[in-house]
């Protein structure tokens, strides 16, 4: 029954280059892009100038530093996603098939947390699908489910989204809110 329902998503295609989704050949908006429409744009140059002044350096150095942090964070996330998908699906060499420029000590902690979760979750979560592309032509949205499980405890499906953020803030530390019509929500990692 579950797998028959998941067949609805067989025509959702994710293209890594350009990070785009299509459903039956029609381009759709990613959920991440959609959510981004309700966030205030980050004033990169303004804040780079402020930070450069505070740290007694140049805007270019700050921008390069931020870009480097972003690349490493994305690589760390990609590595965990690949590791989790391979591990859950019993693929043998999840750590050696990708070359990532990341802080290995920090990543090792993340991997360790995943393995703890995996061992604990085997008691009541049954893996259904990893990196599952989903979408709705009615909503015009597509996205990727990192891991779909069936929960014995809940008697239904549970969606997991692997996170490697340094912090997971549930509130905005600057009291920033999302834009209308979701302005009641804090702008933070949790939203």
Predicted segment positions?
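Pseudouridine synthase
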Residues: 191
């Amino acid at each position: 029954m579950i797998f028959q329902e998941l067949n609805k998503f067989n025509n959702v295609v994710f293209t890594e280059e350009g990070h785009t989704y299509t459903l039956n050949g029609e381009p759709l908006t990613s959920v991440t892009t959609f959510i981004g429409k309700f966030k205030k744009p980050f004033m990169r140059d303004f804040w780079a100038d402020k930070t450069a002044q505070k740290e007694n350096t140049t805007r270019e150095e700050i921008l390069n530093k931020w870009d480097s942090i972003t690349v490493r964070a994305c690589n760390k996330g990609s590595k965990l996603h690949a590791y989790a998908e391979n591990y859950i699906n019993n693929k043998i060499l999840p750590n050696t098939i990708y070359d990532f420029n990341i802080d290995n000590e920090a990543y090792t902690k993340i991997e360790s947390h995943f393995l703890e979760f995996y061992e604990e979750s085997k008691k009541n979560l049954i893996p259904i699908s990893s990196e599952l592309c989903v979408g709705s032509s009615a909503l015009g949205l597509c996205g990727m489910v990192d891991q779909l499980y069936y929960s014995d405890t809940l008697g239904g499906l549970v969606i997991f989204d692997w996170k490697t953020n340094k912090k997971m803030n549930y509130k905005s530390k600057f009291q920033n809110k999302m834009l209308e019509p979701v302005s009641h929500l804090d702008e933070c990692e949790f939203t």
